[in-house]
Amino acid sequence: DAKVSEKFAKSTKRGPLNYVKSAIGEYLRYRSQRYKITTPNGVIAEKAFIIACGNASQYGNNAYIAPNADMHDGLIDVTVVLPITPFDTAILGLLLFSKHIDQDTNIISFRTPSLTIEREREGIIHLDGEPIMMDDRIDIVCHPLSLNVFSRLRTPDKGNFFTNIESSFWDFINSIRSELNV
């Protein structure tokens, strides 16, 4: 995700098509890394494709990486995407836009007030929409209710095509994937 952002930021062309081209190119070159995630509740050691941390549910553009996130609970929502196949990528894309990514078998999700991520090497991360270089150790802490923001009144979410699809459909997809071992 961070490499795609970096490539897209350096590109002279804009628009969704150029973003998709950047994403496909980076996906084909990217190799998952082994990560160690330490929280107050324990340690997780996994090889991962993406680790996303935040206190809001959206990546942006109606892509929900942490559908149950609450900006007021003082917790960081962590979504770990385990190594995936091209087939998994298509399914995860649908789940990302339907607010059901946390139901996929290739996802580990949890909440914590703080965490440390240790990875094999330093590299680019995606921080609030910007690609930046970080060390092989990243410490993350939530400072609850510390940012004051002015905004319009919130209106009820009426959903969209994807959010109105029944979750049983995703159970069906996951059962097929399990049977096919993908």
List the model feature ranges, each with a label.
Residues D1-V182:
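Long C-terminal subdomains/extensions of small-metabolite kinases
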